[in-house]
């Protein structure tokens, strides 16, 4: 399972996120999108070497996140189970020649032969 798909299941979980610049964000996840952008509510934002600031809502861009600190009470086994089974691609049927394969079949003599 991809990390982003796992994180998308963490709605209403309280987590801490450390950013690449050393900032610590502690809040409740309201959503995570496919770019790992994380939206939180009831946030306590602690800039490196500064006093904490309380915010109602905060969105963190995914590429700024260093790591998530998940609560110990979180049941990882149930979250890691994939909800939808993967669909296997269909194999081509026997006896059928796929179009667009090979080099120049059925298109005449080709180029640059000089009429030999």
UniProtKB/Swiss-Prot annotation:
8 X 2 AA approximate tandem repeats of G-R: annotated segments: 100-116
Residue ranges with Basic residues bias: 102-116
GO cellular component terms given for this protein: nuclear speck; nucleolus; plant-type vacuole; ribonucleoprotein complex
Positions of Sequence repeats: 100-101, 102-103, 104-105, 106-107, 108-109, 110-111, 112-113, 114-116
Domain (Sm): residue spans on this chain: 2-74
Xref: InterPro entries: LSm4/Sm_D1/D3, LSM_dom_sf, Sm, Sm_D1, Sm_dom_euk/arc
Keywords: Nucleus, Repeat, Ribonucleoprotein
Record's signal peptide: none
Region named Disordered: 85-116
Disruption phenotype: Post-transcriptional gene silencing deficiency and developmental defects, including reduced stature, leaf serration and early flowering. Smd1a and smd2b double mutants are embryo lethal.
Biological process, per Gene Ontology: regulation of RNA splicing; regulatory ncRNA-mediated post-transcriptional gene silencing; RNA splicing; spliceosomal snRNP assembly
Domain of life: Eukaryota
MF terms in GO: mRNA binding
SUPFAM superfamilies: Sm-like ribonucleoproteins
Ribonucleoprotein as UniProt keyword: yes
Subcellular location: Nucleus speckle; Nucleus, Nucleolus
The keyword Chloroplast appears for this protein: no
Annotated PANTHER family: SMALL NUCLEAR RIBONUCLEOPROTEIN SM
Function: Involved in splicing regulation. Facilitates post-transcriptional gene silencing (PTGS) by limiting the degradation of transgene aberrant RNAs by the RNA quality control (RQC) machinery, thus favoring their entry into cytoplasmic siRNA bodies where they can trigger PTGS. Does not participate in the production of small RNAs.
Misc: SMD1A and SMD1B have redundant activity, but consistent with their expression level, SMD1B is more important than SMD1A and either one copy of SMD1B or two copies of SMD1A is necessary for the plant to survive.
Family designation: Belongs to the snRNP core protein family.
Record protein name field: Small nuclear ribonucleoprotein SmD1b
